[in-house]
Amino acid sequence: NFVTLARSKFYDNTIFHQRPVVEVGQKVKKNQLLADASSSDMGGLALGQNVFVAFMSWGGANYEDAIIISERLVKNQTFTSAYIEEFKTNVRDTKLGPEVTTPDIPNVGEAKLKNLDEDGIVRLGAEVTPNDILVGKITPKGETELTPEERLLRSIFGDKARDVKDTSKRVPHGKKGKVIGVKVFSRERGDKLESGITKRIHVEVAELRNVSVGDKLCGRHGNKGVIAKILPEEDMPYMADGTPVDVILTPLGVPSRMNLGQIFEMHLGLAAKTLGYQAITPPFMGVTDAEIKSELVKSGYPEDGKVKLFDGRTGESFEQNVAVGCMYILKLDHMVEDKIHMRSIGPYS
């Protein structure tokens, strides 16, 4: 039996994508994994990425929990995510006549209409930008007293010359992407629609968003922060063997919050990555600090997990040794592209 859940706003713009991990004809056993989701790998939750981090200040750019990341994460699309938005439009039967979906929109240039099919609906795979038409739609306007010229046009062209206004569904400002789905619900086909609505059209637009300044990242220990700077790879601090760090976190975010788990995770992650194994440890009753020190020594690092780092801009070493390691980082839904806000010119109130 499947448990049904009421759809909530929390899941807006979220993709649920399952894929099978077994093949037709394959014999399966009890408790064997049958399918994976886009957020899991072999049954384990996989929402983030392992990155190489350092706890240090960097010219004040990571002040107040701000995060500095390497341009390498942008180039490799490490934190790129797919974002899907659904746009809906209704075709109504008005008092002045029915609305019509059509690619023949008055006073709109050919360039804006090139992606519309014969019904005025945008085609699959079209790249759309702000103010592009998704569904071309015209609505009858109230008839006014006709001028002699309009009367002549009406007698020549008939209904085509009547008064209509453009009520097309357009891409809102700040949105862009590729059309990946179109659904048409029509009363003629037997679909149940509210009274007065003859047709409803849903258009899904997908956008790939790479990580950028203003996006929010977090770890597994409530250690969240906003990206303040994206540095070129060559400017990032690097180890003696030339390995640059991917993320610079502020050390001032740890003592007051007392979430020391991130420090243990970083040190154990460094040892596990170097020795080539995956460390699975439950919270509160897992690996001890003595075991972490032992693993660090085995992997060739000092037992305190601190190494000498060099400034990528000058090539000089930093005065103090720096704690470095491998940490699991997730990208949160708070993306800077959704945070835009504006006000019209006017008095302050």
Language-model features: locations:
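Cyclophilin-like peptidyl-prolyl cis-trans isomerases
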Residues: 1-17
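Intrinsically disordered, low-complexity regulatory segments
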Residues: 18-349
